[in-house]
């Protein structure tokens, strides 16, 4: 079976937690390409949650995903120093539909501000505007402690955990098989973070932050996480971006 995932510290540790991944063909992709790959062939993918909206045919695992319930997450917002009014924000890193759609909604709902969103591939420090960074660079470069957690903003908005990614497939059978693949995933996932030697490239302050907060990250979904998924994919409807409310095909 092929398994597609975006690449970040959390997904890497999901893969490292699998008891027997020799039968899996695992491939890390940019987050924006995972769903496309899942649609092209019978496979399992950890897709950005808002991709459910444009891919209603996909079956969604009700048991496994990547959910954030506090400050630790994969995306942080950084404000330009001395900025009194927020008008523009630049997105960079491993972007997907989640960040491009939710950034505007977050600032509209929580700050009553209509922001203009742009994309950039420039180095983080060369961008002098407000910015949102997705991925490991938040930690490897030590930026995170200056940033505002996107998960905290989303949690405040939907009153539920921020499920950033969900496991999905065109095949009901593959979703069924995933329960065996991810059996006892949570304890093995957390164990990966208990040994600091298993995390390379992180400065000490980032390593300590991740380890101290890792239990706010969930890879085995509960009812509150499923409610978080439902609330998240309804936000674009409430803001007039889509015409109908989408119901995930949970299995």
Cite the ranges covered by each PLM segment.
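General small-molecule cofactor/ligand-binding pocket signal
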Residues: 25-29, 116-120, 246-248
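Secondary-structure end/capping motifs
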Residues: 174-239
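Short, glycine-/small- and polar/acidic-enriched structural segments
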Residues: 12-86, 95, 99
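Pocket-lining segment of extracytoplasmic ligand-binding domains
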Residues: 118-200
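Bilobed "Venus flytrap"/periplasmic-binding protein-like clamshell domains
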Residues: 1-20, 72-128, 227
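Hydrophobic residues within well-ordered alpha-helices
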Residues: 37-40, 125, 236
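Paired acidic/hydrophobic, glycine-rich loop segments that form the ligand-binding mouth/hinge
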Residues: 4, 42-49, 129-135
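Long, low-complexity C-terminal extensions of enzymes
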Residues: 241-251
């Amino acid at each position: 079976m092929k398994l597609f995932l975006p690449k970040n510290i959390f997904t890497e540790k999901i893969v490292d937690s699998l008891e027997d991944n020799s039968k899996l063909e695992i491939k890390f992709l940019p987050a924006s390409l995972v769903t496309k790959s899942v649609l092209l062939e019978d496979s399992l993918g950890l897709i950005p949650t808002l991709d459910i909206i444009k891919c209603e045919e996909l079956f969604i695992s009700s048991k496994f995903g990547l959910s954030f319930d506090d400050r630790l997450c994969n995306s942080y917002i950084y404000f330009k120093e001395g900025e009194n009014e927020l008008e523009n924000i630049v997105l960079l890193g491993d972007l997907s539909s989640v960040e491009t759609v939710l950034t505007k909604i977050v600032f509209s709902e929580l700050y009553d501000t209509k922001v203009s969103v742009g994309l950039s591939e420039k180095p983080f420090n060369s961008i002098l505007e407000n910015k949102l960074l997705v991925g490991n660079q938040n930690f490897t470069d030590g930026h995170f402690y200056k940033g505002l957690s996107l998960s905290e903003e989303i949690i405040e908005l939907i009153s539920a955990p921020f499920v950033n990614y969900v496991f999905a497939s065109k095949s009901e059978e593959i979703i069924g098989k995933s329960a065996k693949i991810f059996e006892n995933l949570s304890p093995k996932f957390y164990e990966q973070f208990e040994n600091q030697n298993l995390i390379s490239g992180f400065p000490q302050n980032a390593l300590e932050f991740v380890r101290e907060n890792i239990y706010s990250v969930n890879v085995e979904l509960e009812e509150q996480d499923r409610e978080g998924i439902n609330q998240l994919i309804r936000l674009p409807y409430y803001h007039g971006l889509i015409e109908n409310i989408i119901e995930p095909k949970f299995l």
